[in-house]
């Protein structure tokens, strides 16, 4: 998966940077939002808690998707501005502790 940043715009009113990107994935299926988020965090040298992938739209018949990501200045700004659904789809899944199965003999 390769991500190209198309446009990067500062939005001082909302304390964030908006990034329009193109994601190419020629040998695999459409990546998940979390995969794209991790790649953008690495590219932008940002914190995982401050970046959200708002939308990602795959192109029909082409292994390419276009999307919008936002990097906030603080977690307070992110919580105040973003909708709960966007925050939920950008959260890491919780790891469930593995319980050992006991044999009932």
Swiss-Prot record:
InterPro entries: Nucleotide-bd_a/b_plait_sf, Ribosomal_eS24, Ribosomal_uL23/eL15/eS24_sf
Ranges annotated as biased composition (Acidic residues): 92-105
A GO BP annotation: translation
Keyword terms, alphabetized: Ribonucleoprotein, Ribosomal protein
Sample GO molecular function, one term: structural constituent of ribosome
A Pfam family that the UniProt record links to this protein: Ribosomal_S24e
Disordered, as annotated region: 85-105
CC terms in the record's Gene Ontology section: ribonucleoprotein complex; ribosome
Family recorded in the similarity comment: Belongs to the eukaryotic ribosomal protein eS24 family.
Name the record gives this protein: Small ribosomal subunit protein eS24
Organism: Methanosphaera stadtmanae (strain ATCC 43021 / DSM 3091 / JCM 11832 / MCB-3)
